[in-house]
């Protein structure tokens, strides 16, 4: 499994949508429980800026994984790597640098 080695810009968005199973009973009572062991996986919206010559390497890395194949990434200010996929990214090309915006979705397999 490959590792995403590029540094992302500070100020990324992190979204959590816990997966919850909910049952409603006839008298208005409801019961909730987490939907499995990994019910709170996160989605990271990241931005990074790389020199133009490095942009093709980064683009190739993302294309190689194709949105379905996971890779390892260490979120900023955390000490452990997590497995993520990236099914959505875009780039803005300027004179000397290319700015990428991507969405990393945490996975367990």
Curated annotation (Swiss-Prot):
Pfam families: Phage_min_tail. The keyword Plastid does not apply. GO terms for cellular component: host cell cytoplasm; virus tail. It comes from the Viruses. GO terms for biological process: symbiont genome ejection through host cell envelope, long flexible tail mechanism; viral tail assembly. It is found in: Virion; Host cytoplasm. The keyword Cytoplasm does not apply. Keywords: Host cytoplasm, Late protein, Viral genome ejection through host cell envelope, Viral long flexible tail ejection system, Viral penetration into host cytoplasm, Viral release from host cell, Viral tail assembly, Viral tail protein, Virion, Virus entry into host cell. Part of the distal tail tip which plays a role in DNA ejection during entry, and in tail assembly initiation during exit. May bind tail tip complex associated with tape measure protein and allow tail tube protein polymerization on top of tail tip. Belongs to the lambda-like tail tip protein M family. This is Tail tip protein M. It comes from Escherichia phage lambda. The gene is M.
